[in-house]
Amino acid sequence: MDINSTSPLNASPQPDSPPPANASAFAHQLSGFQYSPPHAADSLLPQVEADSPYLDTRHPYSQYLDSAYPYPSPCEWQHDLYTRTRERSPHPSEQRPHARVLQGAPEHDQDQHLEAAGPREGSWQVGPSRSGPSQAGLSPSATPLNPSPPPHATDLETKHPYSQYLDWANPSLLDWQQDLHTRATASPAPLTAERGRSPQPSEQQPHARALQVPEYDQDLIWQRVDAAGPQAGPWQVGPSHSGPSQARPSHAWPSSSAGAEPAELSDFVMDSGVRAWDHWFLAPHMASEDQMSMLRATGLMPTAEVPTTTFLMMGMRHVAEFRGEGVIRIRPSVDFDI
């Protein structure tokens, strides 16, 4: 097939058009076909409105571009609500709504209200504002520590539009003067006097006063222990030959002989050649042969006639008890019932 040949099918969209006579007529007919507007039935794009900027060029996306800009011009962003709010400065009349409300309501004039109410005891007194600047002062019964609210704050008959807010702003209705901290701050004189007063000697040493009471005398306590016997008092350390310290008087404990101190046997050298304290057992125990030899040598061996004897071991009292022939029990004095 010759592609350069002309025919009614490929040369003209109209089948009834006559075939071209020569090449120039064919070119003229072809150019007219390329630039001729299509028919309404052959158009694949919907028709746009008459005011579309793309109507003449028939842009394929003109309908979407028109819907993306609802405003007449895409540069008119200043018509946005938020932008207009930010750019617009408030009018002076809109800056003080409360002042305009008070000035626009003559029936709630403060001067007329004060003249009608009159002075009250313990309330704020406000001078006339028409003659000059407002002068405020305290009534004779009002003090800085006991202020009273303005009359328009508590007068319920006038029905002031801001009475509820003024009531909260009034400190006297909140009873702040009853607060402990406020009262202490308002009257610092008692606190200063309390801090300036030095404590008495009786308040500084309560324990010393208790020890000075006669019934708490330590000597009387030890005398009662002596009267109760050796089993009633606590363990106390008596005088030691190895040092000058003495914990309790000698009369607090029974001795082997009347009026004599118990013998100190710490340095006694036993038959084994060691001192008694080096191998001593501080607990109730049965006496060994060396210990019984020590008691015989010192004359403190208990017998059936003298069942108990007392001696000191490093200042600690010990009692030797006779339990039978050749059986001696030694116990420290701290163990009363063993």
UniProtKB/Swiss-Prot annotation:
It is found in: Secreted. It comes from the Bacteria. Residues 85-97 have a biased composition (Basic and acidic residues). Residues 1-48, 85-158, 187-209, 230-259 are annotated as: Disordered. One of its GO terms (cellular component) is extracellular region. The keyword Secreted applies. Keywords: Nodulation, Plasmid, Secreted. Residues 1-14, 126-138, 242-258 have a biased composition (Polar residues). Putative symbiotic effector that modulates nodulation in legumes. When delivered into the plant cell, modulates the activity of signal transduction pathways that culminate in activation of PR proteins. This is Nodulation outer protein L. The lineage of its organism: Bacteria, Pseudomonadati, Pseudomonadota, Alphaproteobacteria, Hyphomicrobiales. The gene is nopL.
